[in-house]
């Protein structure tokens, strides 16, 4: 077992602790393999009634090891990229199909690949310190780890909004949105974790509290009006009719990789008609294209490595993107 994942049995549960705090518990291939192996073993241990996963430090999991993926892209190592995403998406499916209760305790940053090892589980507990986001369009990827399945199934057009804009949700907001199932105050989280080990997942009902009001509630009508559109062009047009809020969201979208916003819209839109395995297959296929696109290397440089946050996208505007090329990538 890798030092970055601690796996052990505690009472009636198998515990998984993501233990790479200096990297905000970002998932590398070794961690993905360790998580998968533990889940597969514990599936067949009768004494283990549930699995609990949490993160060490201030993050649950900040996503995949995007630096390593960029390095592979720069080196032209498509086999390493394929292996990483293939194994990550296989883990997402293992979690989604897991026969035993799977409980994610989210008490910090949960983004991208972190949502992938959280949202597919049966129970997702969020505290007031939790922060959920799918920020992939900002680095010229797309909402993956099964997001093309779960985003279209969130209320109204909220999923498309979250997937394209990368908007961050606090813990209570994640419950309202459907990404989390229970809100538990941070002060009670360790007691809940201990109770699950002795009394099982029934403890969730005892510790969960009513979520504070949804901070996006006032924006939901506009989100639904705009992001329910059948094309990205129509979303952009509708946003021009929404005053200051629409201007803000337009500016957000136009700051993202133009190509990424287009292919992200396309694959999330298609995900509404696919089951999870089909979504994961389509996502893996799309990674082969987007990691060869110059925007991916540039986006990770600007947002993750150099952190100047001034990416030079190519092309630089949504209207300049070859829509036919994007459509071919999505086939």
What is the role of each PLM region?
Residues 239-244, 253, 257-331:
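Long, low-complexity C-terminal extensions of enzymes
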Residues 1-54, 93:
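Conserved CoA-thioester-binding segment of acyl-CoA-metabolizing enzymes
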Residues 152-198:
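Loop-centered beta-sheet repeat module
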Residues 179-256:
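Amphipathic alpha-helical blocks and their helix-capping loop/short-beta junctions
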Residues 95-139, 161-162, 166-171:
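Glycine-rich beta-to-alpha active-site loop
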Residues 121-144, 178-192:
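Gly/Pro- and small hydrophobic-enriched strand-loop and loop-to-helix capping segments
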Residues 55-90, 140, 317:
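Glycine- (often His-adjacent) and acidic-residue-rich active-site loop
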Residues 16, 53, 65, 117-118, ...:
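Hydrophobic/aromatic residues within transmembrane alpha-helices
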